[in-house]
Amino acid sequence: MILAANFKMNHTRASTKAYIERLNAYGKQTDIDIAVFPPATALDQYETFADIGAQNAYAAEHGSFTGEIGLQQLQEFGIETVLLGHSERRHIFYESQEMIARKFAFYKERGFTIYYCLGETLQTRKKGFEAIRELLQSQLEGIDTAYENFVIAYEPVWAIGTGVAAKPEEIEEVLAYLASLTDAPLLYGGSVKPANIKEVLSIPKCDGALIGTASWDVENFIKMIEIAKEMR
C-alpha cells in the first residue's frame, strides 16, 4: 500500500519540516509506504522513513534552464523520487508528452522512483471508455511501463481538487485496463479524503492513493494512514 502526499504549491520549508517531524512521531506503519512531495523550495535531506520526492524536475543534470531544477539540485538533498506527468503540468504549463517522456527516460536511467500521473478530462470521459483508453495509451507513449521503480497514479482531471471523486466502478475500469499493461503499483488520485479513502482503497487493483488537498494537513494525512492500516 502506498499513500503519497502532493503539496503542490503549498507549505514552506518551516511547515514542511514540522509536517515531517509529526509524521516521524507518528511512526512508520507496517506494509504502508509513505511518500511526500513538497514544493521545490522545501526539498531537503530530512531524517525520515517517508520517501521525499520532487514534484517536477528537468531532464538535465544542470544548465541554462531558468526556473527549473535538475539532477544536481536533487542529488544535493539525496532526492531519488520524482513526480511526472501531473495534469497541472500538462494543462497549466503545457508540458507535451514528448517532454514528459524525455524526463522519464532521464530519471529512469538514473534509477529514480518515478510516480507517473495520467488521466482523462471530463470531455473525454463523456465520450466513453474507448476514448479514455486511447487517451491513456497516448499518455504512455515513450514510457517504459516495465521499469522496476515505476508507480502509476490514475488521476481523472475532472476530479482533481474539485471535491468530486470518480465513482468506484469508473476507477476500477481504468485500473483494470492499466493492470493489463503493467505490473507497476496503481494509485488513484482525485479528491481523495478521509471520508472516501476506505472506499477508494477497497477497489480491485488499487494499491494506494496520491492525495492532494486532503494531505496538506498532517493530522488529516495521518487519519488516512490510520484508515489504510485498519484495512491491511
From Swiss-Prot:
The annotated pathway is: Carbohydrate biosynthesis; gluconeogenesis; Carbohydrate degradation; glycolysis; D-glyceraldehyde 3-phosphate from glycerone phosphate: step 1/1
Its predominant location is: cytoplasm
- One GO cellular component from the entry? cytosol
Q: Where does substrate bind?
A: N6, F7, K8, G161, S191
Positions of the catalytic residues: H86, E155
Domain of life, source organism: Bacteria
- What top-tier enzyme class does this entry carry? isomerase
Question: What are the EC numbers?
Answer: 5.3.1.1
Any one GO BP annotation for this protein: glycerol catabolic process
What HAMAP family does this protein's entry cite? TIM_B
Record family assignment: Belongs to the triosephosphate isomerase family.
Function description: Involved in the gluconeogenesis. Catalyzes stereospecifically the conversion of dihydroxyacetone phosphate (DHAP) to D-glyceraldehyde-3-phosphate (G3P).
Annotated protein name in UniProt: Triosephosphate isomerase
Q: Which organism is it from?
A: Nitratiruptor sp. (strain SB155-2)
